[in-house]
UniProtKB/Swiss-Prot annotation:
PANTHER family: AMIDASE 1
Keyword tRNA processing: no
Protein name: Amidase 1
Enzyme Commission number(s) from the entry: 3.5.1.4
GO biological process: auxin biosynthetic process
Length: 435
């Protein structure tokens, strides 16, 4: 039986609880695993809610089920229902005015991250083994970091987004969460059937100090932890500690006309990364408008505070003469990052610029945090490269994470490296934080 509206007994993670059973076979690769589905994936016969009651009210039940949901079921997993998300996928915060904010299991009183908030919470609270989300600007990576779990944003375009409500197709990426690497690997082999990559050691690991300075405080010492872990597990000779901002400035010439706009920030920032973020958000806004302006203008939906202003700004934005420049920067950036990482290089960066903000944080400090977050999130976002957020544990009662990024299509290599490095990361974090 379906139950609408997640109760707080499930940490407020679920929109609707129901069972979608797999085929009756114990030989399937995901047999015995349960999963939850972000309320952005179509399920035949059910209305896809997209985080907003007016959207649900004005849309018919889906005619077909998302291929990625079908793939998980066909591989033996059992779905336990759909999860709450931020309205129209236009937030990385995780708060929903209409359905309630899912409770962050590892940091109550802090936001769970969005827009795949319920999917992350369902995994972190041990309600399911894995869950499906989407990531346009950070909506898998951020909730994973805030909830202390693994989150994979695959290479853009490699997992079908058919029968998934679009936010901005240029960046929309289906991803997934798990509590452990074994499950993450099992799910990835099913949902991302790329050729196996047997390489487990990177040829280079770039750990840019300027990206870690965006944190504003190095108290969690993740920069030292990742450097020590790579040197110990692999070889210090493969460490590359260049500044990513300088690399971008030198290799993405089209950012020149925008760079001065971001050179006077009082926030901890990297101007070149601020431009990359500006470009991605501009392109995202343009595509969101093309997808949803007609519905917003016709229905005039009830939208939550903060998010309402962001959506209406996107809808009201004119044809931006900078879009051609933005596309040029996107192409140059992807090419430059590919040249940096080559086939088997890794980029290590913070997933987010600090601990999860408190629920109900005031708008100004929250916007500052968002700006710094997108400087980091736009690296994989604009390039389309794959990224996995790795939980390092709790520091002062709050979750800490780090991310590894690899070139487009190197998803299985990326997971190989995570599997090789993870225990060393945990050991180094434990040792560093206890000293």
């Amino acid at each position: 039986m379906a139950m609408a509206g997640g109760g707080r007994g499930d940490y407020g993670a679920f929109m609707e609880r129901f069972v979608l059973p797999p085929p009756p076979s114990q030989q399937l690769p995901l047999h015995g695993l349960t999963f939850a589905i972000k309320d952005i994936f179509d399920i035949a016969g059910r209305v896809t809610g997209f985080g907003n009651p007016d959207w649900a009210r004005t849309h018919a039940p889906a005619a077909a089920t998302s291929p990625v949901v079908l793939a998980a079921l066909a591989a033996g997993a059992t779905s336990l229902g759909t999860t709450i998300m931020d309205e129209m996928a236009y937030s990385i915060n995780g708060e929903n005015t209409h359905y309630g904010t899912p409770t962050n299991p590892c940091a109550p009183g802090r936001v769970p991250g969005g827009s795949s908030s319920g999917s992350a919470v369902a995994v972190a609270a041990n309600l399911v083994d894995f869950s499906l989300g989407t990531d346009t600007g950070g909506s898998v990576r951020v909730p994973a970091a805030y909830c202390g779990i693994f989150g994979l944003r695959p290479s853009h375009g490699l997992v079908s987004a058919e029968n998934v409500i679009p936010m901005a197709q240029m960046f929309d990426t289906v991803g997934w969460f798990s509590r452990d690497l074994s499950t993450l690997s099992r799910v990835t082999k099913v949902l991302l059937p790329l050729p196996d990559d047997i390489v487990k050691q990177p040829t280079q690991v770039t750990i840019p100090m300027d990206c870690f300075q965006i944190l504003g405080s190095l108290d969690d010492r993740t920069y030292q932890i990742i450097n020590a872990s790579v040197a110990k597990r692999f070889d210090s000779q493969i460490l590359d500690n260049r500044n990513l901002g300088d690399f971008i400035s030198d290799n993405v010439p089209s950012i020149g006309k925008f760079i001065t706009d971001f050179s006077e920030s009082e926030l901890p920032s990297v101007p070149a990364l601020s431009v990359i973020s500006h470009v991605m958000r501009g392109l995202q806004r343009s595509q969101f408008k093309a997808n949803h302006a007609e519905w917003v203008n016709t229905v005039k939906p009830n939208l939550g505070p903060g998010l309402r202003e962001r959506i209406l700004e996107a809808i009201a934005s004119g044809d931006n003469e900078s879009l051609e420049d933005f596309q040029a920067i996107r192409a140059e950036f992807k090419s430059a990052l590919a040249a940096l990482l080559k086939d088997h290089g890794i980029l290590a960066i913070p997933t987010v610029p600090g601990p999860p903000p408190k629920v109900g944080m005031e708008a100004a400090p929250l916007e500052n945090f968002r700006a710094r977050a997108f400087s980091l999130l736009s690296i994989a976002g604009l390039s389309g490269f794959c990224q996995v957020s790795i939980p390092l544990g709790m520091r002062n009662g709050l979750p800490v994470s780090v991310s590894l990024v690899a070139r487009h299509g190197a998803d299985h290599f990326l997971l190989n490296v995570v599997e090789e490095l993870y225990q060393t990361l945990i050991d180094e974090a434990t040792k560093t934080w206890s000293s």
